[in-house]
Amino acid sequence: MKYRWIAVVLILALGLSACGQKTDAPAASAQHIPAALKTTLTPDSLPQYDFTGQAMTYLAYIAEHFPNRCASDDASGHDAFGQWLLSELAGCGYDQVQTQDFEEKSMYDETVHGRNYILTFPGRSAGKQIIVGAHYDGDGAGDNASGVALALATAAGLANAKPYYTIKFVFFDGEEDGLLGSKYYAGHMSADEIANTIYMINLDALVFGDYCNIYGGVYGDDYDAGYIALSEGEAVPEPTLTEGYDFAADTAEALGFRVHRTAELDGYFEKNGRGMTPEDAFFTNPWTNAHPAPENMFAASPATIGASDQAGFAVKGIPYIYFEATNWWAAGAEPSLAYTGYIETEDASLGDGGMFMNTEYDTLETLNELFPGRAEQHYHLFSPLLSALLLVKAE
């Protein structure tokens, strides 16, 4: 979610999708939208795994040894991280990791040579799959060593599991340059792959923000993933394709977690003049057309804007589930970013006006100093939910 504001400015000015090019999307049809995600969800029926300890270990290791993983930067630890990732997965018993190289223009019109890493975990069903994505490029602990750490910990922890669906863990490159790796991957999926993908789960920036959020949904019948050019006073289209979010929220509740959904959040800020008190619970974007953000209304609940790797899949009609930690109720120090979900903490004196991603403050040292125990607290929410979503039969 790193380049969100630059993208928003471009989109509002030009009316284009990310990277300045609108992705062709299929028309709504049964072959592109999976069957309703319905199953009996009870604590006894759900697999319950928590890989927080391993995620914390990976987060600390990546932050220390690979603080700079920027794409196409020979001076960074980008390539070294890729070699370590392959070695780590091989140590978990995964020796058939595929690489997907690409050459794409960034949103700055620079050529980026990137590489995605794809781990395929075969399932028992015929052709059905779930995709888990986390981008590894960048230079932040929160953004996005935290997402990579959880994906790695989950892949390692489930190495001996027998999932119903095939699971693909994809470590994307080039997110910071315009979602390049994820759009390339999604753009090269076959029609059968698209039709047989239950949902895509995006893990991005999980540890700094005040609230643990789940998102899902796109805007309009053309599957706009979240970039919309709005006239003054025009409402954001109501989200569709929210099956992924709904199923994730249902699963979280079945696991015993508190989930604050759109209906509960709608109008809370207007009534109380503040956001809810942070707690060990799941939240989502609180803004709706009935009770919009005080400023900068760009996204309607439970969706977000398409500034992370779920976007390329959403425009293909694939339901997504997006995990992120941030604070939609925070105004921050920069008016143009107020209430957009880009401000991660309420206290604007921390970080850069309440922001950490894409700043010098996105380090593990800062995280532990300002928010001791927060990373572990968040992983204790995200990890069990992720594992359950990968192992439960969703149809």
Descriptions of predicted regions:
Residues L14-A18:
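C-terminal motif of bacterial Sec signal peptides marking the signal peptidase cleavage site
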Residues G20-K22:
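Bacterial signal peptide processing site
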Residues L41-D50, A63-D79, E104-Y108, H135-N144, ...:
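Second-shell loop/turn segments in exported
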Residues D50, Q54-T57, Y61, S76-G91, ...:
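Extracytoplasmic/secreted proteins, especially bacterial periplasmic and envelope-associated proteins
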Residues T57, Y61-P122:
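A non-catalytic alpha/beta surface segment that caps or lines the substrate-entry region
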Residues L119, K128-L179, L386:
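Alpha-helical metal-binding/catalytic segments enriched in His/Glu/Asp
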Residues G174-Y320:
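Metal-dependent peptidase/peptidase-like ectodomains
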Residues A330-E395:
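His/Asp/Glu-rich mid-to-C-terminal helical/loop segments that flank catalytic regions of hydrolases
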